[in-house]
Structure formats: C-alpha cells, structure tokens
Swiss-Prot record:
It comes from Shewanella frigidimarina (strain NCIMB 400). Part of the 50S ribosomal subunit. Belongs to the universal ribosomal protein uL1 family. This is Large ribosomal subunit protein uL1. GO terms for molecular function: rRNA binding; structural constituent of ribosome; tRNA binding. CDD domains: Ribosomal_L1. SUPFAM superfamilies: Ribosomal protein L1. Keywords: Repressor, Ribonucleoprotein, Ribosomal protein, RNA-binding, rRNA-binding, Translation regulation, tRNA-binding. GO terms for cellular component: cytosolic large ribosomal subunit. Binds directly to 23S rRNA. The L1 stalk is quite mobile in the ribosome, and is involved in E site tRNA release. InterPro entries: Ribosom_uL1_bac-type, Ribosomal_uL1, Ribosomal_uL1-like, Ribosomal_uL1/biogenesis, Ribosomal_uL1_3-a/b-sand, Ribosomal_uL1_CS.
Length: 233
C-alpha cells in the first residue's frame, strides 16, 4: 500500500468523509488545509439529478459571481466595426476577425475566454477543432455569442463562470480563491446554485441538486449541508 504524504494524512485526520458540513465550517476547514505555496482556487462539484445521456436534460449556461473568481481573465473577441471598438473599450485584450483567426491557427492562445458577435461565427466556425477541445468555443447558451460583445466582455472580466454537466451529470467550476472571506465564498456558491436551479430542465424528475462538494486545488472534497445555504431556505 502506498505511503500517505504528510498532507494526505492531515486531510484524512481533519476531514470527515461521512459528514455534511455547514458552509461556514467547510470554508474555514479548507482554508486551514490549504498549505500549497500558491493561492489555491476553491472549486465546487454539484451532482445534479439529471440523465446526461438525454440532450434535453443537459445543463449548460453562465452566471456572474457576486465576488468574481479572483482570476485575471484575458478575453479574445471576434467582431468588427463599432463592435470591435466597444469590445476594446470594455477591456478585451484581443479583437479581430480573420487576422485573429490566423493567430489562433498559429498557436497564439493567450486568452481564457472567446466571445463572438453573430456575424463573426463564419470565421470562428473554422476554428472549432482548435477551440472546441479547450472549452473555448463561443456558444449562445453561455452568452459568448452575442450582438452585445461589450457586455459579454464586462461579464467575463467581472467573474462570470460557465458551467456544463459532465457525462455523470456533475457540474465542475470554481467559486473563488482560498484568500476570499467565508462570506464571499458562501455568496458565490449560493449564486451558482441559484443559477443552476433556474437552468433546471423541465423534464428532470426527483431531487435536482443531489450533492454539493467544495475543495481546494490541492485538497480533499468537503460535502456541504445544503440547509446552510440561503438558496436552500
């Protein structure tokens, strides 16, 4: 049997895998265990009561967290004319059409989010094999294909997170950094859960939000008592 690292031993001793933690207690515990030499992210996994094999039960969208994610987000926008000027004014790092597409094809991928105006999708569509596998392909459901590119840029910069269930019906995303206050992480999580509930497929049956767990980049997952979230009350 492999020998546990000191960090793993501490996590095993401190985290009760059978317990549902109050959100405040969970955040304090994760912050105590976050001993990496970098500022760890706080990630969340939400198990949804959906059948991910059925397209009409898949959950996908985006929401702006009230306290952001703590990340500096670089935004690329495919658009032209007045929209290009508006995107630059809103803070986009890269703006263009065919010229920007050529940079992407050449491997210049120094951005975290891609936004496109509808008229630019003829250009972006040819980049599907590059952007798709990286989760960067613009999509109307996440607000990244829109005539109002300036607003989309502002949302991305303000801490918008995109979510999409995996093949097991689980949503994985981030809700901030371990340096955030307990209240900030709690409110970000509540905002995400609220958005997920609004995105509930009409055909989904039974309990929708089945389990919520939060973890740090290098830490163990801690299951959350949903009753400790305002959204659940």
């Amino acid at each position: 049997m492999a020998k546990l690292t000191k960090r793993a031993r501490v996590i095993r001793e401190k985290v009760d895998a059978t317990k549902l933690y109050d959100i405040n207690e969970a955040v304090v515990l994760l912050q105590e265990l976050a001993t990496a030499k970098f500022v760890e992210s706080v990630d969340v996994a939400v198990n949804l009561g959906i059948d991910p094999r059925k397209s009409d039960q898949n959950v996908r969208g985006a929401t702006v967290l009230p306290h952001g994610t703590g990340r500096d987000v670089r935004v690329a926008v495919f658009t032209q004319g007045a929209n290009a000027e508006a995107a630059i004014a809103a803070g986009a790092e890269l703006v263009g059409m065919e010229d920007l597409a050529e940079k992407v094809k050449a491997g210049e991928m120094n951005f975290d989010v891609v936004i496109a105006s509808p008229d630019a999708m003829r250009v972006v569509g040819m980049l599907g094999q590059i952007l798709g596998p990286r989760g960067l392909m613009p999509n109307p459901k996440t607000g990244t294909v829109t005539p109002n590119v300036a607003e989309a840029v502002k949302n991305a910069k303000a801490g918008q997170v995109r979510y999409r269930n995996d093949k097991n019906g689980i949503i994985h995303t981030t809700i901030g950094k371990v340096t955030f206050t307990t209240e900030q992480l709690k409110e970000n999580l509540e905002s995400l859960v609220s958005a997920l509930k609004k995105a509930k497929p009409a055909v989904a049956k039974g309990i929708y939000v089945k389990k919520i767990s939060i973890s740090t980049t290098m830490g163990a997952g801690v299951a959350i008592d949903q009753g400790s979230l305002e959204e659940a009350k």
